[in-house]
Amino acid sequence: QDPWVKEVLRLKSFDYLLGNEEKSRSQDITIITIDEAAIEKYGQWPWPRDVLADKIVELRQAETGIIVMPILFSESDRFGGDIEFCDKLSYGTVIAQTGTVQKRTSNPVPRGVAKIGDPLAFLYEWPGMVGPLPELADCTNGVGVINTAPEVDGVTRRVPLLMKIGDEVYPNMAIETI
């Protein structure tokens, strides 16, 4: 491995080259964020799940393809809207999130990944994860991991596509979406 200074200089040079590249944006992707106007309208976050269920219905009526929700639903809704929310999640392709943690946990979201050879030696490894409620995970078409791999200077330039969590291999959110 290179000395820290050499590594940082190489990474910053890479950043400079990428920063000067012309960027194009797809018209096929829409990102919906939770902004100040939405918080004024619906109240503080997290919103009750029936509000989120209504938003999924609105997106479906707008004929969206895939809905990706990078929101961790690891606890029951305090307003009791999980059943309606689960019903709306099953309207079409909805992808949920799971996150990694430093302590070993049971893997609440069993998902399949095809393996050829032994990929485990090459994957980022985490002892456990915090997944969505099992009943909500069952209503979605997929669950992807959101995690990054920052470089020595603290900047994230790459995201692991697969991760080993406990004894299982999980895809990241982007791969699960595809």
Protein language model regions, located:
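Non-transmembrane functional regions of envelope-associated proteins
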Residues: Q1-I178
